[in-house]
Curated annotation (Swiss-Prot):
Record-annotated membrane-spanning stretches: 15-35, 61-81, 88-108, 112-132, 146-166, 184-204, 240-260, 274-294, 302-322
Keyword line: Cell inner membrane, Cell membrane, Membrane, Transmembrane, Transmembrane helix, Transport
Membrane-topology descriptor: Multi-pass membrane protein
Protein name per Swiss-Prot or TrEMBL: Vitamin B12 import system permease protein BtuC
Known function: Part of the ABC transporter complex BtuCDF involved in vitamin B12 import. Involved in the translocation of the substrate across the membrane.
Gene Ontology CC: plasma membrane
A Gene Ontology BP annotation from the UniProt entry: cobalamin transport
Any Pfam family the entry gives: FecCD
Domain of life: Bacteria
Family affiliation: Belongs to the binding-protein-dependent transport system permease family. FecCD subfamily.
Subcellular location: Cell inner membrane
Subunit structure: The complex is composed of two ATP-binding proteins (BtuD), two transmembrane proteins (BtuC) and a solute-binding protein (BtuF).
Organism: Shigella dysenteriae serotype 1 (strain Sd197)
Length: 326
């Protein structure tokens, strides 16, 4: 028994090391790749100081943090709702953040500061997450809870579309492109949003014990002495915060929170002590690679990263649905 535990521990360490190396390679490639390839030896040249340190580095850090936040949010929501298909984008949380953002633009008539827009996006994400939690407490079946989340997402998407369609504001029309997801406008001025993600990310990665209990189910968690009401509300607040900040920073990006936790679980990383940091590393790596594709796929324009992740993630999602139905 002890030997099996040690083997599993060594395997987990190997996975985390491999994911760390993958993330570092993706980060290095992201800093080098662009309209002009800049190798590490040229990073401190006048050209490198502009393109690498002022343009690519803030974007790369934002992509890394958002990818980690979305993947961890997916893992947390799957444990909270006891639903392997739970994910911020699929369950409407990202769209809720978008509704909060657009409502702020409409009510503020484009005069609100960036920090106020970010807080409104966070509030929208929290409201949708709390509604989903209310549905979960009614002990709905997995399929019905999933459908409820999809319906909330459709409602939020319809509200955003109506608002943008009837708006004469140029800023609001530009939000439609922004809601497809993209890091094109990220620079050091958004560093406060990046900093807002770090403490919540680190805190959630340290909460493996309650997450493992929640993954066992509500009855088992109660029997083990876990205060469900406290942890549910705290984790809902943390998830809503991460998704809201991510949407405020880069728009709606789907499938990262769904696919990454599933793939890691299929690889044997079921313990949240390993799954949560693994999700952070894998989510950051996946979104960095998707951002590189979005930047380089077309010579004349940049693809919305939400389109790239949806194109790559949709087939994986269909495969997961088919596998879950067997």
């Amino acid at each position: 028994m002890l030997t099996l535990a040690r083997q599993q521990q060594r395997q987990n360490i190997r996975w985390l090391l491999c994911l760390s190396v993958l993330m570092l390679l993706a980060l290095l490639l992201s800093l080098c790749a662009g309209e002009q390839w800049i190798s590490p030896g040229d990073w401190f040249s006048p050209r490198g100081e502009l393109f690498v340190w002022q343009i690519r580095l803030p974007r790369t850090l934002a992509v890394l943090l958002v990818g980690a936040a979305l993947a961890i949010s997916g893992a947390v929501m799957q444990a909270l709702f006891e639903n392997p298909l739970a994910e911020p984008g699929l369950l409407g949380v990202s769209n809720g953040a978008g509704v909060g953002l657009i409502a702020a633009v409409l009510l503020g008539q484009g005069q609100l500061l960036n920090w106020a827009l970010g807080l409104c996006a966070i509030a929208g994400a929290l409201i949708i997450t709390l509604i989903l939690l209310r549905f979960a407490r009614r002990h709905l079946s997995t399929s019905r809870l999933l459908l409820a989340g999809v319906a909330l997402g459709i409602i939020c998407s319809a509200l955003m579309t109506w608002a943008i369609y009837f708006s004469t504001s140029v800023d609001l029309r530009q939000l439609m492109y922004w809601m497809m997801g993209g890091f094109g406008g990220v620079d050091w001025r958004q560093s406060w949003l990046m900093l807002a993600l770090i403490p919540v990310l680190l805190w959630i990665c340290c909460q493996s014990r309650p997450m493992n209990m929640l993954a066992l189910g509500e009855i088992s968690a109660r029997q083990l002495g876990l205060p469900l009401w406290f942890w549910r509300n705290v984790l809902v607040a943390a998830t809503g915060w991460m998704v809201g900040v991510s949407v405020a920073l880069a728009g709606a990006i789907g499938f990262i929170g769904l696919v990454i936790p599933h793939i890691l679980r299929l690889c044997g990383l079921t313990d949240h002590r390993v799954l949560l940091p693994g999700c952070a590393l894998a989510g950051a790596s996946a979104l960095l690679l998707a951002d590189i594709v979005a930047r380089l796929a077309l010579a004349v324009a940049e693809l919305p990263i939400g389109v790239v992740t949806a194109t790559l993630g949709a087939p994986v999602f269909i495969w997961l649905l088919l596998k879950a139905g067997r």
